[in-house]
């Protein structure tokens, strides 16, 4: 095809393969190559990937909150708030890995949080390839001007030039689906953006302009602190399209020791190990509006009530605290998501977790930390967002099948078992689910309450194959301190042969007589114990019954295997051991 002043050809792509966001389909891309030839013989050639998609949006009659449609299909928004590195020194590979990890977490969009700035092209290119939608907040927004510095605004010509360049930089990316005026308030110069800049530089209507992050069909405001897991199911903010839901997300011990001052010698009264370094890295109590209690001490209270205070006030005690924090992470992140699941499409049309990542070493608000480690809550979060999911609703003790495939699912069987700590069966139930419609599908029974500590194992079979399983520790008063007294579990690993795509299958078996909790796998170098990051696992922090065997896969290792590769396995009640390749 050739364009000349006399021949402005129309570009027609017959029956194109559509670009779909993750969970709805494949993000098909095309490449357009343009070459400009001047009469003097000079030429310039440039290639641009692009995708073909259609975006629509409306307010749900059921929730009165926003719903997005891509290529004619409703999209339940599963998002995260993304922030840039504090020193702006990430490599291109790191930006790409941030996107890949988001898709692996079952997210279909990321919000580039307003004050964080404008990421490089690598970030958007990866989002195009992975099918991760992006919301781009504009700079110099409500937070960056009027809220934090009343009366401040950059010169108009500077703002206009910066905003123009942002629009031109990102407008060709199919992953871009939202422009947003800014964080928690309209942009002070919204009229310039919507009246001049967007109509001039992005007039094609392939994305939507959102006035503010918590307006125009979205809501925000947390909760930003950890709640007891059951309370998420009745919290009024766990509804609508919530743009910021934020449990704490304490990182793993291996990350904590990177930035804490050890040994800890002084700490807040009755709150070991919380000292000034913890506070500096965001473990603070701060006020919040509308009854919001942004207090890290509330998370610490939950750890101490549910799992017990650290056993000692030395480094061993810190490791004990970190292990108990992972138990809390696991139940908290799952509860927040399963509370949304319980109202899927009826009261909820989407969410964005606060936050997806961290811009520096932090002890809260993250599912992937600054070192690219995923804590236990990252995996329970991911599990709760699987296409077909079975869950226990903590508020009314019902069991439900969640279907987010977009189509009815048939030939489903739900199995539920309750055990005491000695693995004695206390209750069993099977039910065939005729057809699980998109959304939440309660079963016909509830799980009876039992005295003391018990374990609930749920399985969902589709065509005879287990497609979802879930494991809960339950106690009427939420006192789980007895977990610390569980006998050590023996877990065996069997490494398979690397497949053509580089994926390595790993079979994990509980060979003990009791449950194995939060079984964690790490790729390490055997002689040094140094962990290889990032390393993507299809699942991790496993909870296994006696004799239970699962297969997970290790894949996505950008740096390649370490010199002497090995897998370390450990868990809350699983002594660490190493299996070499």
Annotated model-derived regions:
Residues 11-14, 33, 195-196, 334-339:
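Short, well-ordered amphipathic alpha-helices
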Residues 1-111, 118, 344-348, 373, ...:
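Secreted/periplasmic carbohydrate-active enzymes, especially glycoside hydrolases
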Residues 19, 52-55, 77-82, 102, ...:
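Long, contiguous hydrophobic alpha-helical segments, chiefly transmembrane helices and signal peptides
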Residues 233-410, 415, 426:
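Substrate-binding clefts and catalytic carboxylate motifs of secreted carbohydrate-active enzymes
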Residues 20, 100, 167-169, 229-232, ...:
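Short, flexible, glycine/charge-rich loop motifs used to bind or transfer phosphoryl groups or to couple energy/partner
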Residues 16-19, 41-143, 152-178, 282, ...:
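Active-site-adjacent substrate/metal-binding segments within catalytic domains
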Residues 101, 165-169, 197-200, 335-343, ...:
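A generic secondary-structure signal
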Residues 109-288, 328, 332, 348, ...:
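Substrate-binding/catalytic cleft of secreted carbohydrate-active enzymes
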């Amino acid at each position: 095809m050739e364009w000349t002043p006399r021949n402005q050809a129309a570009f027609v792509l017959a029956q194109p393969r559509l670009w779909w966001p993750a969970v709805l389909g494949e993000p098909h891309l095309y490449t357009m190559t343009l070459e400009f030839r001047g009469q003097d013989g000079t030429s310039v050639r440039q290639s641009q990937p692009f995708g073909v998609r259609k975006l629509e949006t409306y307010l749900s009659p059921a929730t009165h909150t926003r719903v997005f449609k891509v290529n004619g299909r409703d999209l339940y928004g599963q998002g995260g708030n993304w922030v840039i590195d504090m020193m702006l020194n990430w490599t291109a590979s790191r930006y790409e890995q941030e996107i890949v990890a988001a898709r692996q977490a079952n997210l279909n969009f990321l919000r580039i949080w307003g004050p964080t700035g404008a990421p490089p092209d690598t970030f958007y290119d990866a989002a195009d390839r992975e099918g991760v939608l992006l919301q781009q907040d504009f700079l110099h927004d409500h937070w960056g001007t009027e809220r934090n510095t009343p009366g401040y605004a950059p010169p108009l010509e500077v703002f206009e030039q910066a905003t123009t360049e942002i629009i031109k930089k990102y407008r060709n990316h199919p992953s871009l689906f939202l422009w947003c005026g800014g964080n928690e308030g309209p942009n002070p110069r919204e009229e310039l953006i919507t009246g001049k800049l967007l109509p001039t530089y992005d007039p094609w209507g392939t994305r939507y302009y959102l006035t503010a992050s918590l307006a125009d069909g979205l809501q925000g405001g947390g909760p930003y602190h950890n709640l007891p897991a059951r309370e998420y199911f009745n919290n009024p903010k766990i509804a609508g399209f919530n743009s910021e839901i934020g449990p704490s997300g304490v990182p793993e011990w291996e990350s904590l020791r990177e930035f804490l001052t050890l040994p800890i010698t002084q700490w807040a009264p009755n709150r070991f190990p919380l000292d000034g370094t913890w506070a500096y890295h965001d473990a603070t109590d701060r006020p919040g509006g509308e009854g919001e209690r942004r207090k890290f001490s509330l998370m610490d209270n939950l750890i101490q009530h549910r799992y017990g205070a650290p056993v000692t006030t030395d480094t061993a005690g810190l490791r004990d605290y970190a292990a108990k924090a992972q138990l809390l992470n696991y139940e908290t992140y799952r509860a927040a998501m399963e509370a949304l699941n319980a109202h899927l499409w009826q009261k909820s049309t989407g969410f964005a977790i606060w936050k997806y990542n961290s811009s520096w070493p932090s002890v809260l608000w993250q599912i992937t930390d600054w070192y690219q480690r995923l804590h236990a809550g990252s995996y329970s979060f991911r599990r709760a967002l699987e296409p077909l999911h079975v869950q226990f609703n903590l508020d009314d003790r019902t069991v439900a099948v969640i279907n987010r495939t977009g189509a009815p699912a048939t030939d489903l069987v739900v199995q539920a078992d309750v055990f005491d700590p000695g693995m004695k069966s206390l209750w069993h139930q099977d039910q065939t689910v005729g057809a699980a419609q998109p959304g939440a599908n309660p079963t016909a029974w509830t799980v009876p309450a039992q005295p003391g500590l018990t374990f609930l194992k749920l399985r969902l079979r589709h065509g005879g194959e287990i497609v979802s399983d879930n494991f809960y520790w339950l106690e009427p008063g939420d006192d789980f301190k007895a977990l610390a007294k569980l006998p050590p579990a023996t877990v065996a690993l069997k490494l398979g042969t690397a497949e053509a795509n580089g994926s390595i299958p790993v079979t994990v078996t509980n060979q003990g007589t009791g449950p194995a909790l939060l079984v964690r796998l790490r790729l390490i170098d055997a002689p040094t114990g140094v962990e290889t990051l990032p390393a993507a696992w299809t699942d991790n922090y496993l909870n296994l019954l006696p004799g239970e065997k699962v297969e997970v896969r290790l894949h996505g290792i950008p740096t390649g295997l370490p010199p002497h590769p090995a897998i370390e396995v450990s868990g809350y009640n699983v002594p660490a051991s190493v299996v070499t390749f």
